[in-house]
Amino acid sequence: MLPAFSSCLKGVFIFCLLHFCSLNSFAQKDPDYISSFNDRPHLTFELASRKQDVVIRNPDAENIQLTYRPNSRSNFIACIDYRWLSLSLGLIKFQSSDGDRKGETKQFSFRASFNGRRFWNSNFIQIFNGYYLSNPQVANPSFNPQSDFYPYRPDLTTTTFFSNVFYCFNPDKFSYRASLYQLDRQERSAGSVIAGVSLRMHRMLSDTGKTLIPNELESQFKPEYRLISQSASNFSFNVGYVHTFVYKHSWFLTLYFVPGISIQNSYYLSEDKQIRNLQNKATAVSEFRFILGYNGDNWYSGISSYSISFAGKRDLGVWVDDNYSWFRMFVGYRFKAVDRTNLPDWRKKIQL
């Protein structure tokens, strides 16, 4: 394990403390704006497409840019939501039809969220094994994308962990839980400024120790820029705005934009076998999400798109941008409310 991951454990400790904010953050709501389905267990099924682009730039020649991405078509996901707890697990991966030319990618994903009205916290881990170079024309101008085989790295694995805590400034009229987890329903259009902190821990490893720079371009990159593996952590401060537009009671559109400043610590292993430590570098981060859906009394469904980007910088030496995007279609059902009169004491204490 590269050193950056062990140094990030202190950040995980901070977030473990913040998780408990959500257990005691059920602010009062205005019933004209928010209806709650808090005591009804939710079961949701998703068909999701996830991408994670690793963009490698040459600090000495910005026109040289290599983009590696997983060849993952879609993933079938099951989600359980009840009161403040939300869990999801990727169950089935559907193979891509072009796997013979771009290679196959294995993937795993798991999410755990703690959802109050004023505070919410989300934690997510995803793993991809197997990447292909999506723009091989940079190294081979004669490449034919219709018939040629893409350069494929079955040895390349990325592991990414996200965690965030956000605060809602208008919890009595706006519910983030309504659009994302359908634990509530937004009855009237409303929005809120939100602010929070987030943590990303990212590791990219190559089992073979081979550089990600194609042979044709090695002369364009200094040895210290010929990336083999990377470990990075980002602690970000975010402020933005989210708004839900309601149409005819049950139809909704949610737009979410949250930019921020990120403090990045990175370790890079290059072809010269030196590990370089780049600490406390300020970079930009931005998040965008839209959700369009239907939220009825029992059934709900919709589509959503989410993207987050961590921009690299020239002065970091090895210039790497990490771009994440998710698209999902979902449908879910609410079961009858749980009788809480005979719950064990431990569940009453944690309000679950």
What are these regions (language model features)?
Residues K51-N75, S86-G103:
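Surface-exposed strand-loop-strand hairpins of Gram-negative outer-membrane beta-barrel proteins
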Residues L47-D53, Y82-S86, L91-S97, G116-R118, ...:
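Transmembrane beta-strands of outer-membrane beta-barrel pores
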Residues T67, S134-V138, S147-F161, M204-E216, ...:
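Extracellular/periplasm-exposed beta-strand and loop segments of Gram-negative cell-envelope proteins
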Residues F162-V165, N323-L352:
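Outer-membrane beta-barrel "beta-signal"
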Residues P41, S74-A78, K106-F110, F119, ...:
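Hydrophobic, lipid-facing positions within transmembrane beta-strands of outer-membrane proteins
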Residues L43-L47, A78, L87-L89, A112, ...:
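Membrane-embedded beta-strand positions of outer-membrane beta-barrel proteins
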Residues F37-L43, S74, R83-L85, F108, ...:
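Outer-envelope beta-barrel architecture signal
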Residues Q28-D39, N170-G191, S206, Y247-L253, ...:
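Short loop/turn motifs that connect adjacent beta-strands in outer-membrane beta-barrel proteins
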